[in-house]
Amino acid sequence: MLKSVGVILVLSSPSGCGKTTVANKLLEKQKNNIVKSVSVTTRAARKGEKEGKDYYFVDREEFLRLCSNGEIIEHAEVFGNFYGVPRKNLEDNVDKGVSTLLVIDWQGAFKFMEMMREHVVSIFIMPPSMEELRRRLCGRRADDSEVVEARLKGAAFEISHCEAYDYVIVNEDIEETADRISNILRAEQMKTCRQVGLRELLESRFPIED
């Protein structure tokens, strides 16, 4: 049986489109087929968090060293702490045939598409409409009206980049969206270009006679 190299599955969407819920549902449905990327961070470990499972915990100096050496592909600063995606883990997973899920914004997604194009499968999750997105954001009751408007403006800008992704899915139902992504993942894993040893198999079992 042929084995395939791992896929780097990148999910992006505006705030309020359900990407985190979809990602968790996908990991539940495909628990033996894909793992979530483990980020490097400079923040202190919280109670119950485990090194290598939740995050890789490093100090600021080490994080900056990793960035300067190209060992961190994409990073951001949040509330004074750095978070980044380690290159080695992704490359190791690809080589081992393990697919990896990344949930990142469009800028981070574009960086991955540029640096690891042959392994990246990018999916943009859309809201059914801007009106529905407004309803969802207001329904969370976590932000005031100014923040909601800012999120909607940002969403429109993010959506304007969706055509650069491999797939666009309108998220009307979490289960259905997760199922669609599961189907995409399985199909991408089976692509001819990702089948390890295909040429050797053809030459050994199906030789062309002169």
UniProtKB/Swiss-Prot annotation:
Top-level division of the source organism's lineage: Bacteria
Binding residues annotated for ATP, in chain numbering: 13-20
UniProt cross-references to InterPro entries, sorted A to Z: GK/Ca_channel_bsu, Guanylate_kin-like_dom, Guanylate_kinase, Guanylate_kinase_CS, P-loop_NTPase
Enzyme class of the recorded protein, top EC level: transferase
Enzyme Commission identifier(s): 2.7.4.8
Gene3D superfamilies to which the protein is assigned, alphabetical: Guanylate Kinase phosphate binding domain, P-loop containing nucleotide triphosphate hydrolases
Any one Gene Ontology cellular component term annotated for this protein: cytosol
Keywords: ATP-binding, Cytoplasm, Kinase, Nucleotide-binding, Transferase
Chief location of this protein within or outside the cell: cytoplasm
A UniProt-annotated Pfam family: Guanylate_kin
Single GO MF descriptor: guanylate kinase activity
Disulfide bond positions: none
Residue ranges of every copy of the Guanylate kinase-like domain listed in the record: 6-186
Subcellular location: Cytoplasm
Catalytic reaction equation(s): GMP + ATP = GDP + ADP
PANTHER family associated with the record: GUANYLATE KINASE (PTHR23117:SF13), GUANYLATE KINASE-RELATED (PTHR23117)
Membership in a protein family: Belongs to the guanylate kinase family.
Record HAMAP family: Guanylate_kinase
Function field: Essential for recycling GMP and indirectly, cGMP.
The protein's name in its UniProt record: Guanylate kinase
Organism encoding this protein: Anaplasma phagocytophilum (strain HZ)
This protein's encoding gene: gmk
